[in-house]
Each structure stands twice: as structure tokens, then as C-alpha cells.
From Swiss-Prot:
Binding site for ATP: 128-181
Name of the molecule in the record: D-alanine--D-alanine ligase
Similarity comment: family membership: Belongs to the D-alanine--D-alanine ligase family.
Annotated ATP-grasp domain residues: 102-295
Transmembrane segments: none
Binding, Mg(2+) 2: 262, 264
Protein's GO biological process: cell wall organization; peptidoglycan biosynthetic process; regulation of cell shape
HAMAP family tied to this protein: Dala_Dala_lig
Any one GO MF annotation of this record: metal ion binding
Enzyme class: ligase
Cofactor(s) needed by this chain: Mg(2+); Mn(2+)
Recorded catalytic activity of this chain's protein: 2 D-alanine + ATP = D-alanyl-D-alanine + ADP + phosphate + H(+)
Length: 301
């Protein structure tokens, strides 16, 4: 019986999401027959290292946000020689840095929206892109700190002054249409889901039960579904990801335009999360999904 440590919590703004993910994962792994213990991660890295000594057979990394999915904890685990789920240091750090990720995607010829990384003083003075456009942190997930600026919206300077996500912001063309997402397990795209939310698909819509509706499979033409799955796998490979990822898209029906927004190297594992839903749609129940992720990690050693 493998001994598995589940890392959950963390010190990012996505701590509560990680706690929910980690608890669900731990319960599923116990159901699948693993010897599981949970490590609630806080600011004391030494305590985490101590809790991982002696080393478990594998770590299920259920952390989200900075320090949990940006290559930091991955580097610690590599140093300790402990296999872990999801992507390694390089892929995790690149995916978390939206500017670096988009450079990789552009080099791979993947479809992107127009975008610019701008200093906050420049953002306060003028629009960096034609409106409507999106303002988002360079290195946060779960739609933390995301705003849409439309014609007539006078919040730009206020947003720049109140910004607490570093000295620059990612600005990106707002693509009208539908929100699509595709989960990938190594080289297999699972399904295409359309996310329907009232208004913007923000942090609350992502994680509050009933705040958004998931249509799986998405009601899009077969050619669009195939395109989204192909791009998701290509993005996973371009970043050098391992295990599970989830790629998010916008699709404009009127122009048949599909654009890749980002790749999530630590997809949510909460009751409303998309990866478990897509896996279930493909016949993989939640304990089996979690077990696959552990075995995928363990076999890399």
C-alpha cells in the first residue's frame, strides 16, 4: 500500500479552494486503498519539510496559486527526491507566468488573443488595448484580480492605483462568445465543457455551488470540439507539462474564432471542478482519477 501525502492550503489567495480540493482528494485516495495523510501548508516551510520526513511514496499536490503551482513547492519536492503529481518546476513556473506562457504558445503557433503586459503607471494613464479588454494579474489563478473594461467604464486608473498583484498587469483583448475548457491527462484530451455563468466567470462563479453551469459535452460543432482538444494537448506539450492540466478557451460563434487563454497546471479538485466532471464523463470516477494521478507521479522515478 503506497503512503501518500496530500499537500493542501498554502499561503496564496486560493487557500480555501486548495483546502476544499485537498480534503476531497484525501478522502478519494483513502477510498482507493492508499495510506493517506494530509499536510496543511502554511508559512513555515520547515514544518512542511519535517512533515514529509520520512518521505512518503508520493505527494499529491493539491495546492493552488503562488508557491503551490508556480514551481516553488515542486523545487522543494525535487530536492527531497519525492515524486509528486502534476507538472515539474519549469512547466509550473512558465504556466503561472502568463507572459512567459503566452510566449511559448505563440512560438508553438497556438491561437491567442491580442495581449500586452503593462506597468501600472502606464495602465493608469491610458488604455493599452482597444476596449473591451481584460486586466488580470500575471501570476494568479482562479480569476483572482480580474477585471473587464468596456466602453464608458472609468475604473482603469482606480484599478491601477489599487492593484496588489505586482508592478505590472496582463491586459488582453476581450473575445466575445463562449467559455470552453478542456482537461488533459498526459496526451489525452478528455472532453470539451462549456461554462455558463451569469456575467463574468469569476472566483465565486468557479467555486460556489450553483454559481455556474457546466454543459458537457459543449454544444459546439464537432470541428470546434476537435480543434479545442488538439490545442489543449499541444499547449500541454509546449509547456512540458505532466499529469493533468486544464486549458481554458474563448470561442466566438460569429467568427468561428477559438483562442487559448491559459493552461492550469493544478486544476481544481472540488465538487464543482471541471477536471473531475470531465473524467466522470469519460468513465473515470473520482477515486480512480486521483489514483491515476498518484501512479502517474510514482512511475516517473
Amino acid at each position: 500500500m503506497k503512503r501518500v501525502a496530500v499537500l493542501l492550503g498554502g499561503i496564496s489567495e486560493e487557500r480555501e479552494v486548495s483546502l476544499a480540493s485537498g480534503r476531497q482528494v484525501a478522502a478519494a485516495l483513502r477510498k482507493a486503498g492508499y495510506d493517506v495523510f494530509e499536510i496543511e501548508v502554511g508559512a513555515d516551510l520547515g514544518a512542511v519539510i519535517a512533515a514529509l520526513t520520512p518521505a512518503p511514496d508520493a505527494v499529491f499536490n493539491a495546492l493552488h496559486g503562488r508557491f503551490g503551482e508556480d514551481g516553488t513547492i515542486q523545487g522543494v519536492l525535487d530536492y527531497m527526491g519525492i515524486p509528486y503529481t502534476h507538472s515539474g518546476v519549469r512547466a509550473s513556473s512558465m504556466a503561472m507566468d502568463k507572459g512567459a506562457a503566452k510566449a511559448v504558445f505563440a512560438a508553438a503557433g497556438l491561437p491567442l488573443a491580442q495581449h500586452r503586459i503593462v506597468p501600472l503607471d502606464e495602465l493608469a494613464e491610458a488604455d493599452p488595448l482597444p476596449r473591451p479588454y481584460v486586466i488580470k494579474p500575471v501570476n494568479e489563478g482562479s480569476s483572482v484580480g480580474v477585471f473587464i473594461l468596456r466602453e464608458g467604464d472609468n475604473r482603469r486608473a482606480d484599478i491601477a492605483r489599487a492593484w496588489r498583484h505586482g508592478s505590472v498587469a496582463m491586459t488582453e483583448e476581450y473575445v466575445p462568445g463562449r467559455e470552453l475548457t478542456v482537461s488533459v491527462l498526459e496526451d489525452r484530451a478528455l472532453a470539451v465543457t462549456e461554462i455558463r455563468a451569469e456575467g463574468f466567470y469569476d472566483y465565486t462563479a468557479k467555486y460556489a455551488a450553483g454559481a455556474s453551469r457546466h454543459e458537457i459535452p459543449a454544444d459546439v460543432p464537432p470541428s470546434v470540439s476537435a480543434r479545442a482538444r488538439d490545442v489543449a494537448v499541444a499547449a500541454h506539450r509546449a509547456l512540458g507539462c505532466r499529469g493533468a492540466t486544464r486549458s481554458d478557451f474563448r470561442y466566438d460563434d460569429e467568427t468561428d474564432r477559438l483562442v487559448l487563454l491559459e493552461v492550469n497546471t493544478q486544476p481544481g479538485m472540488t465538487p464543482t471542478s471541471l477536471l473531475p466532471e470531465q473524467a466522470a464523463h469519460c468513465g473515470i470516477d473520482f477515486p480512480a482519477l486521483c489514483a491515476w494521478m498518484v501512479e502517474n507521479a510514482a512511475c516517473r522515478v
